[in-house]
Amino acid sequence: MSIYLDEKNPEKHKPFDDASPDIVAYVRYLEVIAGKSPNTAFSYYCDLRNFSRFMKRRRGLVTDDTEIKDIDPKGLDTAFWGSVTKEDVYEYLYFLNSECGNKKSSTARRLASLHGFYDYLVNQVDLLKENPTASIKPPKQDKVLPKYLTAEQSMDLLESTQTQSDFPERDYCMVVLFLNCGMRLSELVGMDLGDIDMEQRQIRLFGKGHKERMVYLNDACMEALQIYLNKRNTMEGLNPKERAVFITRRRKERISNRRVEQLVTGAMKAAGLRGFSTHKLRHTAATLMYQTCLLYTSDAA
């Protein structure tokens, strides 16, 4: 659960060894063999640490009044994982719902973490013969329509980045790329100068699992990038070896995921938009592209 570790900075917690040996080995397998991103591997790591704590309390290895967050997740061997039953897993799902207040989607994700862990123990490294999660289905999800900005709200957001920001060229450019290219946050933050091909009007992005894809740049993106890069490349004190496309104003180094989220959230609030997140811009891009083929330009903002 996110209250135990900072899930925004998975690299900070490497080598992810504050767990039982089987969990540590599994997380390494996810990154090295399965090709999962650090964020994905870290999510599984956090989920399995939490399950370890729960099982220690359920088996009486700590006193009943011990807070889950205070239980050491280490010290569980392969034999212990082999002793886990389907009933234990059902009780864990009930715990997530009743004590932790998890949404169905969060509970389903944590169950998926257990599915993956036991599949690894049974089918990848042959340490166990039975998978107690094999027949357990995730909670039925409520159907919720994706939330996205309307065309008018998107224009308001773009205008906000130009009037409320201390680095308007950068913030406007980031939002234009979000809205037109449907980038993930990690893809935008991870962009290097060498990934941009202005002549071919495309950007190389690295998504989940380090998968590479090329994204076309329309006129709006080209204009926003040119204006921002002209500003970026003439900033006093900028290290000429800095590869990151989007940098901070003060330290002139790669901007972080969290900082982008803060900037976008601030621009949304200034535009009177509530209940939206950076990820919703990805939904907005796909929806508006389908509905109107709308292009966002500086003239419209």
Tell what function each PLM region has.
Residues 1-299:
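Conserved catalytic core of the tyrosine transesterase superfamily
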